[in-house]
């Protein structure tokens, strides 16, 4: 399939070329030709090898590790498109790094998420498309439209097809800040929710307990970012002690930083489900399964280009089984 409108162009930078290629296949828009290289001193240079004049440009780039290299590559690409007279510049950032720095937790801390938003806008971006951004309020840091796609519909469809729904399943927030996400998935699965909390402060996460009844239930732990694996590991131990029969874990973004696999392999989690928003070179647990967000992002890209609403992609409809 080839998309009929030649005014839409799709470019992939270096953070996640595999995901960009899948998006290209689903949209029917071939990836544009460009070269991006890094000099010995770390400077990045980009050269687009085709015209973008009066075109609607979509640039696919997660700001994942190495975060700053990928962020600067994106900024330079935006500037290149702007100077080459692109009609619109739309950045597709499946994983938006720095979103966790959305407030001042202690005195004299920066709000780096706002700084990054300003840099992207100043470089010349007209719109941002992202996937389950860590803090939804970060959307307000941008002076351009932001489309934040929620991953819960993807996960819900997967679990329903796997038979994980209904009264035998309970969706658990592994920390008290994740209640809204857990409730959203539970609504799709027609299941109850529970929360893992800790008697001590959230940082130490000791003396954990469950608010809710997980005894004899199949537990699905849900979070947005899987980084060190500690949050899932601690929660898995708590729900196992509370009588969970099976434990699953799901996260939108699988960063799997160094040592995460070792942490997760020590606990009894049957399957860890993540999207392909991030590429990591670190070792991952053997029970990790990837669920591609490419078709989801591709549909959003076409809707944006055609001026159609994006919200129908994640509207909740009670499944008919």
UniProtKB/Swiss-Prot annotation:
Lineage: Bacteria, Bacillati, Bacillota, Bacilli, Lactobacillales
Pfam families in alphabetical order: Pribosyl_synth, Pribosyltran_N
Cofactor comment: Binds 1 Mg(2+) ion per subunit.
Native organism: Lactococcus lactis subsp. lactis (strain IL1403)
Gene Ontology molecular-function annotations: ATP binding; kinase activity; magnesium ion binding; ribose phosphate diphosphokinase activity
Residue positions binding D-ribose 5-phosphate: 223, 227-231
EC nos: 2.7.6.1
Annotated ATP binding sites: 41-43, 100-101
Name of the molecule in the record: Putative ribose-phosphate pyrophosphokinase 2
């Amino acid at each position: 399939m080839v998309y009929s409108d030649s005014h839409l162009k799709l470019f992939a930078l270096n953070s996640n070329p595999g995901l960009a290629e899948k998006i290209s296949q689903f949209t029917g828009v071939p990836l544009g030709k460009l070269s991006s290289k890094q000099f010995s001193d770390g400077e990045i240079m980009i050269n687009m090898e085709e015209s973008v004049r009066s075109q609607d440009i979509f640039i696919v780039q997660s700001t994942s590790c190495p975060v700053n290299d990928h962020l600067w590559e994106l900024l330079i690409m935006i500037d290149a498109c702007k100077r080459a007279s692109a009609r619109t510049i739309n950045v597709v950032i499946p994983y938006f790094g720095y979103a966790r720095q959305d407030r001042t937790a202690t005195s004299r801390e920066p709000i780096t998420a706002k700084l990054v938003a300003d840099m992207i806008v100043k470089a010349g971006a007209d719109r941002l498309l992202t996937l389950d951004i860590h803090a939804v309020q970060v959307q307000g840091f941008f002076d351009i439209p932001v489309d934040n796609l929620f991953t819960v519909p993807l996960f819900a469809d997967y679990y329903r097809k796997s038979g994980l729904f209904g009264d035998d399943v309970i969706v658990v927030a592994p920390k008290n800040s994740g209640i809204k996400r857990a409730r959203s998935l539970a609504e799709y699965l027609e299941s109850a929710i529970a929360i893992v909390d800790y008697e001590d402060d959230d940082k130490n996460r000791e003396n954990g307990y469950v608010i809710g009844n997980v005894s004899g239930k199949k537990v699905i732990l849900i979070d947005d970012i899987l980084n060190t694996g500690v949050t899932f590991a601690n929660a898995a131990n708590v729900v196992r002690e509370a009588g969970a029969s099976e434990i699953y874990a799901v996260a939108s973004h699988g960063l799997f930083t160094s040592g995460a696999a070792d942490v997760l392999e020590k606990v009894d989690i049957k399957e860890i489900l993540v999207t392909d928003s991030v590429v990591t070179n670190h070792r991952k647990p053997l029970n990790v399964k990837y669920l591609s967000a490419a078709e989801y992002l591709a549909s959003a890209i076409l809707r944006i280009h055609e001026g159609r609403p994006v919200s129908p992609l994640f509207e909740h409809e009670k499944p008919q089984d």
